[in-house]
């Protein structure tokens, strides 16, 4: 499958009266690494579970190359969601790591046993252990192995580095990038460790309170955003007419994020300081509730 597109249209999910996702429209193209970023409870896991048909939506539709995904086994061969493993769940009661991997090999049509074995060796994972006895870091290693060895064209990972030490996290980022370069698969990585993984993401998706704040090329977004600081009156004068977010006030001083439109420029003056912003700082500013043109 080449140049495939996975998309959702007006996707809504409710649990009882609580709306977790609200009328989402999202298009994922093959051959990209997406970062899915949001606060706890933003709906990230729910979105990934819906896109992979592990969970039905309340309204809307999910399509792979124009074909509905729900109960479509042919389409689902190309999608895999490696979700967080809860070792205390009855699903894994008494199950050993090697048994889970055997189930995955039988269930996933493109399972790469050689890659799975290579990752087991890299992570020094004891496959004879029961999943209920594993640490958080070890269960994260299993989700990584399942995701990468699935060879699914659209692969979703939910907080894959949770509980991993810095060495193991760097190993994961390197392996993910190598696999992406070699295969051209699409990866969606949900993570709270934004800065560490930022260089991996070709595009970022900011999810906030069940809605998509933005979907943007990472480098373009970093170039669009600047942090402007100085005396309040100087800052307000400098950002007049610009889109601003995340205003911070300290006494007579002020700082604010400016997001420039294509072709729009920020004039340099001695009265204010302009600084580039990290992906994490941009996300925090956009979620702050401030959204205005001064």
Predicted regions span which residues?
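Helix-to-loop junction immediately C-terminal to a conserved catalytic motif
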Residues: 52
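The feature captures the beta-strand-to-loop junction immediately N-terminal to the Walker
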Residues: 34-39
